[in-house]
Amino acid sequence: MFSGVKKKMSKLLSVNKNKYKEKLIDETILGPDKLNNMDTTIHSRDDNLEQVVEQVVEQVVEQVVEQVKQIEIIKRELEENGYSVISNVYNNEEIEEYMSEFFKWYKNTENVEELHTIIHGNGIFKYFEIGHQRFAWLARTNSKIVNIFKQLWNTDELVTSFDGCCYYAPEFKGTHNYWTHTDQSSRKKGVHCYQSFLSLTNNRERTFIVYKGSHLLHEHYFTTLNIDEPYDWSILDENYISNLENKKIYVNVKAGDLVIWDSRTFHQNTCGNSNCNEERLVQYLCYLPKNDIKNNKRQQQLRRECVEERYTTSHWPYPLAIVPAQPRYNYYNPHNKIIIDYNTLPCPILHDLKEEIDKLL
């Protein structure tokens, strides 16, 4: 506990470091940007070193108190509503970097833009090694996002899945279709997973639909309809869902927001009506505790294979479900099967992220 800041402070204090020990805050809460700010503050002052450190520690404590409060709010919203929206997790610079990397890949990788709406239902990328592109890993290894999940699961070590993203271009024209679903098997009771997306765009209409509090109806749904669903994904009976209109929320998200939800929660996305011209880009992210019996040696080995072979998966970090390499559907011409030539795809540049990637495997 408190290892990151302790190391930094111990270099600055040759005496009395135990005086500040109980106040020092783990960098897993603050993130490296806050620690860098602390360094700048300390080295830019000519005051007595001990006084400077005391002031910095007090500022850190205040920041951490606020972050602890925020985590408690997130936990309460997940418990009561089944979802939570955390504002401004990504800053403008991070949004711009993700967008730049995404569109560089989207526009310049052969067949990606041309085939996207033909083979990807509901705007969701599954193919083209989407789960291992640089923009995906930039978000997936972001310390602020990882730290939120560490706090949710009360652990210092997480593992990740290799999910894709969702993109609707502004000019996309489509009609809203029903595909409300749950991402948790009927055989799993209670909380098993929190999943999320990072929004890179502002969306009110072409957005995420969630049924508030529906995670508490998960078991009721399967019991009432006498359904045994072994898989962690199933579209829900439309008649049942029609009775939940008072719980239906079109989530208003801003660029930089992180939306987290309980995998039991009933949800879907929507492209909006035929007049909607919102652009929508979100990156799906999910993490579970590394130290769990379900994260066995086979899962650990498979996770590394997924990275080496650049396999995309569902949102569950375990058990991993690998997405088939070739499209199952052609949404415009079912009789014309499309084959992706993976030999032509460029290799993503990830060497500078390797250390952070390894921590999540």
Regions picked out by a protein language model, each given a short descriptive name:
Residues 42, 48, 66-81, 87-187:
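Non-heme Fe(II)-dependent double-stranded beta-helix
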Residues 188-204, 286-289:
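Short, conserved beta-strand element in jelly-roll/cupin
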